[in-house]
Regions:
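Short, well-structured N-terminal submotif of metal-dependent ribonuclease cores
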Residues: 1-44, 54-67
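Active-site neighborhoods of divalent-metal-dependent phosphate/nucleic-acid chemistry enzymes
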Residues: 2-6, 73-119
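Generic structural signal for small/hydrophobic residues in well-ordered secondary structure
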Residues: 13-14, 52, 85, 111
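Conserved glycosyltransferase catalytic-site signature
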Residues: 14, 46, 103-105
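A generic structural signal for short hydrophobic patches within well-formed alpha-helices
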Residues: 17-18, 49-52, 125
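A beta-strand edge to alpha-helix "cap/lid" segment located at domain peripheries
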Residues: 127-129, 135-136
């Protein structure tokens, strides 16, 4: 990283982590690998942590993954973020847009509250980007 440049802070969605751990050759995985190589600030939030860990069956892999994710920058959710999440969901619903997983509204609310980019591979974030200015990669 060049002197005087700022690191990019990126909240990495569960969809990207899963494909990364599975070594899938997908564009979002390539972007994630570039962020890691460039030593950008990789962030996680509680919802993403839960989604990743709940899908792991093997105890050793669970412990290893928990340790790895514990090294990420943790973005906490405040009460206002939960309210914002509900507002996002309700606003899109009034426009006839159904977000399939309400946790995606929570993840978007965290990203927006902390003013970080969201790296994802989930179409639920597209209308949030369009209607709320979510900074998505």
């Amino acid at each position: 990283m060049a002197a005087g440049t700022h690191r990019m802070m990126v909240l990495v969605d569960t969809t990207v982590w899963i494909d990364f751990f599975s070594a899938k050759p997908e564009p979002h995985v390539n972007t994630f690998e570039t962020l890691i190589a460039d030593r950008e600030d990789i962030c996680i939030c509680g919802v993403i942590l839960t989604e990743i860990l709940q899908g792991i069956r093997d105890n050793a892999e669970f412990s290893q993954t928990r340790k790895l994710l514990g090294n990420m920058i943790y973005l906490p959710m405040q009460v206002d973020d939960y309210v914002r999440s509900a507002q996002i969901y309700r606003h899109l619903r009034r426009k006839g847009i159904t977000v399939r997983k309400s946790v995606d509204c929570m993840i978007a609310a965290v990203a927006m509250a902390h003013d970080v980019f969201l790296l994802h591979n989930d179409r639920d974030f597209l209308p949030i980007k369009k209607h709320f200015g979510l900074k998505a990669l």
